[in-house]
Amino acid sequence: MSPVRRWGSPCLFPLQLFSLCWVLSVAQSKTVRYSTFEEDAPGTVIGTLAEDLHMKVSGDTSFRLMKQFNSSLLRVREGDGQLTVGDAGLDRERLCGQAPQCVLAFDVVSFSQEQFRLVHVEVEVRDVNDHAPRFPRAQIPVEVSEGAAVGTRIPLEVPVDEDVGANGLQTVRLAEPHSPFRVELQTRADGAQCADLVLLQELDRESQAAYSLELVAQDGGRPPRSATAALSVRVLDANDHSPAFPQGAVAEVELAEDAPVGSLLLDLDAADPDEGPNGDVVFAFGARTPPEARRLFRLDPRSGRLTLAGPVDYERQDTYELDVRAQDRGPGPRAATCKVIVRIRDVNDNAPDIAITPLAAPGAPATSPFAAAAAAAALGGADASSPAGAGTPEAGATSLVPEGAARESLVALVSTSDRDSGANGQVRCALYGHEHFRLQPAYAGSYLVVTAASLDRERIAEYNLTLVAEDRGAPPLRTVRPYTVRVGDENDNAPLFTRPVYEVSVRENNPPGAYLATVAARDRDLGRNGQVTYRLLEAEVGRAGGAVSTYVSVDPATGAIYALRSFDYETLRQLDVRIQASDGGSPQLSSSALVQVRVLDQNDHAPVLVHPAPANGSLEVAVPGRTAKDTVVARVQARDADEGANGELAFELQQQEPREAFAIGRRTGEILLTGDLSQEPPGRVFRALLVISDGGRPPLTTTATVSFVVTAGGGRGPAAPASAGSPERSRPPGSRLGVSGSVLQWDTPLIVIIVLAGSCTLLLAAIIAIATTCNRRKKEVRKGGALREERPGAAGGGASAPGSPEEAARGAGPRPNMFDVLTFPGTGKAPFGSPAADAPPPAVAAAEVPGSEGGSATGESACHFEGQQRLRGAHAEPYGASPGFGKEPAPPVAVWKGHSFNTISGREAEKFSGKDSGKGDSDFNDSDSDISGDALKKDLINHMQSGLWACTAECKILGHSDRCWSPSCSGPNAHPSPHPPAQMSTFCKSTSLPRDPLRRDNYYQAQLPKTVGLQSVYEKVLHRDYDRTVTLLSPPRPGRLPDLQEIGVPLYQSPPGRYLSPKKGANENV
């Protein structure tokens, strides 16, 4: 079909041509009109835009509907803009109803590289004669009075024909040519058709009371279509005068659209010359008056006054036609009708409307809001998204434009309209808010919103614009519409890490799965473009070439880094991991950061003895017997895989047996001879425990047993090879090697300091000795003197006394053994009853006291138990029973515990406690500590004892006495020894009675009753009548407790009548 171009009158042609050229130069837009018939087959070509617009079509040219349109009605081919009928076809009656003209209007955009063009297309759908007229009813009854005048019109029901124009209803006639009636078909001012039965001659009911006629309705199609209906006319005999309107059959009224409700339009004063009820006229709207008119206008039934009942709107309807019927009330009332035409006068009461249609994206679904708005605009209806329908602007609109859009890109189509007429309906539009967008005229009442600059969503994500439309009325009305343009995100930003390098520290031996750190990257884009995921970049780690993914892992969502294995500082000290952050855009952008994982050392390696190599945890060093003191006899080398303080090694010799004769450099590992081995026989073995520890917290240690074997000869024994930088080789003349292995330089300031320190030490020791002696003498004077007993059979010099260990070893014969307590040599104190002159020479005492060297006491002693075969004092270890041990000799203190006596060693008689009792200083029965000595029971007793302490032959006659329950303390020793035999007080350890050997507890305290025999001992305790010799106990290595037969106890003479005779077998039952 060729396009229909209507250029108007010749006088307006130059003006239209000028306007067309101006529009083409600015917007490159044009209006094209086509026409087609309804019921055309789907696919029928209506026209081609490219040909009709004389456009050169290239490969990049495309035509697209500006708004989403119902493709079932019309289709636009994208390549050349060819318009065709859709699959559903075009039905004019369904699209436009009874409208005289049916036009489909829409906009098409032509895109190319050079420019884009907006084409306004109007397609007129022409009617075809596809519908025949039809009567509402097949039988139509009509009544007419016999007194009706010629020309009386009787309304008939109009046939309906859905076609319009020439194809619509054209004629309605009677089939009988000779009848007193004629049917006339008229068209009203509003376009509606009406049919009247016109009386051609007077009627006489008496001659013919009814007429049966046939109505024929015919349209103007080719060929024409027709329909018939039966018409029954009944002639009534009644009132012969009808009411008459003074205005005639037609009355016209003009009404302003802003007239208030209740305004009078017309006074219909109809008169009837008849009298009585035949002349009483009643007014009413005729049957053809539409319901809308009945709602807007009110007719008084008695007076005939026509008033305004509701507001009218010129833009909605500008003309109303009312049928008013006046009827009398006589029998067979007569009626007259009057047609009232109400014309509405326009005023400027409507503000302009603004409709914003964003550019629809290709392939947008038809259910989207943009598609619904476009379809509604194309069909000429109201905006589907507007709740108030047509004429109500939306509160705001939103468009979406990508941030990568070029300048002059189309954003939206703005359409303005005003329902007023004339100058009141002329609208102008403007855009405010930002210079990045501007408004460009498109065609009449329409504008294009285009970009005026490049956009960046990261800088401005949303533009708030304002559209203002104003008409030219007096006064003008204005509409302000907010408009939002949101910038769509594109993937133009790569993720960025907060730091290029992350430093992380982790201790070695971490558990697998341990958390290390979290890296964070930010992407300024939105949605998937800003969704950051993390991953490891593969690389080889260390010399082994393992993949970094076997060491650590990263959470793709959070960036948290976890260890997959336990790290070892000795094999891997730093792990460089490169993390890549990628977004979810297309194309994908990424960046990376370096994570340096530093492994911190832990003390997880114990020292390893390297040289000499141990055999089963033992070392053997041969030392010549004539080796000089401070000579390096061996060098110990060890290594530790840890570093720093964890790898710093310290050497120490512990548990040297039988005495301390060697020392080791704490840092160098050089073992020096510190004792004299010249008197040791070859083969003598000195054992020590070598402890090598590192500087960790806690430290790790390695131990080995070192055996020093004394060999014959004067040279040095084999030692570890000294390194070139060892202290022995690098010692300058005049210096000596210390125990720690460091070289000491004997310079003058050092000598002065040593001399001064030694002098001060000697002076302090002398002051302490004098004060101690004076204090002791004051106490002895205060007590009235010490009890001293002569030792019978004491021999001078160093001769062995009868009963001594040496004599027992030579086989001097059987004798009772004794319990001797060694004292510190040189203290000046002797046992009970023995003068100080009776003390053995220092050489003899030194030979018996362990740890003494060269006849000088070491300051330590031990509890020495003398047995039948040999003395075991050589293996006893020193132990002080009081906190002041080693400072001052302390006397033993005896305390009655309620069931047994216990002895302790204290510095003073009133200071035998080492802890607070919780009582006050003046409390009755105050005791500062538990002095029972129970902690030493199991250390002092190594094996079970059988029998009592001091049973004699007298016990068989007189029974057991108190002496049987306690050892001898005050009696003289009949068998002197070469040592100072300190008498044993009865206030010693709690006596123990034998128990079942299978029991776990091998002793219990014996209950000692207060007898006359023990009363003397108890009084001695109260008067502090005891020896001040220090008694030292040795818990680690106690000798065995003497048996009953081995204890020499003097006979105790019990007073007669003191005890009853024991029963037979009492001795065995104890």
Swiss-Prot record:
Signal sequence bounds: 1-29
Chain ranges passing through the membrane: 750-770
Residue numbers bearing the Phosphoserine modification: S1054
Listed GO MF terms: calcium ion binding
One term under GO cellular component: postsynaptic membrane
Gene giving rise to this polypeptide: PCDH8
Official protein name in the record: Protocadherin-8
Membrane topology of this protein: Single-pass type I membrane protein
Entry-listed glycosylation sites: N70, N464, N616
Originating organism: Homo sapiens
